A protein has these predicted regions:
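Amphipathic alpha-helical scaffolding segments comprising HEAT/armadillo-like alpha-solenoid repeats
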Residues: 273-275, 302-313, 334-340
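Loop/turn-rich, solvent-exposed surfaces of beta-rich toroidal or solenoidal domains
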Residues: 271, 275-300
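A beta-strand-loop signature enriched in Asp, Gly, Thr, and Trp
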Residues: 206-224, 235-267
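Alpha-solenoid HEAT/Armadillo-like helical repeat scaffolds in large eukaryotic proteins
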Residues: 264-268, 275-280, 308-316
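Iron-sulfur cluster-binding cysteine motifs and their immediate structural context
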Residues: 12, 182-206, 226-250, 308
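Short inter-helical turns and helix N-cap capping residues of alpha-solenoid HEAT/ARM repeat scaffolds
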Residues: 286, 316-318
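Auxiliary alpha/beta "docking" domains used to position bulky ligands
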Residues: 1-176, 224
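Structural detector for internal amphipathic alpha-helices that build alpha-solenoid repeat scaffolds
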Residues: 290-301, 322-333
């Protein structure tokens, strides 16, 4: 209970324990890698054995402490306005890696005083976190593969500490999805290929965040007005009716949420870095962000936006030019259908 009180004092919304052991889906993860389903996410191939078993991360590891931190925005933003791009809600505030990292450093110091040795991770480390979150009873894996919390819904981050402290494990939580298939049915690109099966190479979040090159033509229209991530399978989850706004001030909605897409096209490198300072969007880089913006304008823009896209074609990199040309063609095609 003392450890859980420390977590609560640091602002975490849940804290639970499970035994350090091989991850439940370790073999499935290896098969997934063997089938190249990680796409451009080469980092997932690093240290696969360590990802499967936290005991390889900390000598004498006994417990995995799993933490949940709510990020559901307090502000309501009208994203249905014409000409506005969509960001995944997790990116509305400051970069969660930095926010959670500071909390975990303080948590680790407190555990040291209790005699523990530990390492901590915020999704960048080698650990199959959803397996341990399920085992610890934080929530369960939905059919979209997203972890669902009974009080936070789908709007929370996971973090873990692997420790030598021997803590009594919590009970796993049963899967409560029942017959619901809303997340599967709503996916714009059919990336959820079956219950609990996700092909990231079809996922809009993958294309707009992880994919490094040109976005395949077959997926561009489905991306719609999304410029960073996709929340479709999260939004429809019925468990979100219990979700409450995050109390973490650093997750407050930033000024770029709700900005017109055309304004993004005018950002130079320094403007991009300034606007997205301390945001996860900054890690995407200006070139890939403008690639996404061009697609969003192509899907939602009007003829008045074409001169802005032509300016991009005259001044920007080959990848951005190619997506801007596609956007102009998409707008013209849509406009001709309206006029006819």
């Amino acid at each position: 209970e003392k450890v859980k009180l420390i977590a609560k004092d640091l602002g975490f919304d849940d804290c639970r324990f499970t035994k350090a052991k091989e991850a439940t889906h370790a073999q499935e993860f290896q098969k997934w890698l063997n089938e190249d389903k990680n796409g451009d996410m080469e980092w997932m191939e690093n240290n696969p054995e360590r990802r499967k078993d936290p005991r390889l991360l900390v000598e004498g590891a006994s417990t995995v402490i799993v933490l949940a931190l709510n990020y559901f925005p307090t502000e309501k933003v009208d994203l249905n306005k014409s000409g506005v791009g969509r960001f995944a809600k997790y990116a509305w505030g400051n970069d969660y890696h930095n926010v959670i990292d500071k909390k975990l450093k303080n948590f680790a110091k407190a555990l040291e005083e209790l005699g523990g040795e530990q390492r901590f991770y915020v999704d960048y480390g080698p650990i199959l976190e959803r397996d341990f979150a399920t085992d610890a009873g934080v929530g369960w894996n939905g059919k979209s593969t997203v972890q669902i919390h009974p009080k936070l819904g789908t709007w929370f981050f996971l973090a873990e500490l692997v420790t030598t402290l021997n803590l009594n494990p919590d009970q796993p939580m049963p899967n409560r999805c029942g017959t619901c298939t809303k997340c599967i049915d709503c996916c714009p690109t059919d990336a959820i290929t079956a219950p609990n099966k996700m092909d990231p190479r079809r996922c809009i979040s993958y294309f707009t965040i992880e994919h490094k090159g040109s976005i395949p033509l077959e997926f561009r229209e489905s991306i719609g007005d999304r410029v960073f991530g996709c929340d479709e399978c999260l939004e429809v989850c019925p468990w979100n009716r219990f979700a409450k706004a995050s109390k973490e001030a650093k997750f407050a909605t930033r000024e770029f949420v709700g900005m017109p897409l055309i304004q993004f096209l005018g950002l130079n490198e320094s403007g991009f870095r300034s606007l997205f300072r301390r945001s996860p969007v900054k890690r995407l880089g200006r070139e890939r962000f403008l690639r996404n913006v061009c697609i969003a304008i192509g899907n939602s823009g009007k003829e008045k936006d074409i001169p802005h896209l032509r300016k991009v074609i005259a001044e920007e990199s080959e990848m951005i030019k190619e997506h801007a040309k596609w956007a102009i063609d998409a707008i013209k095609s849509r406009s001709s259908l309206v006029h006819n």
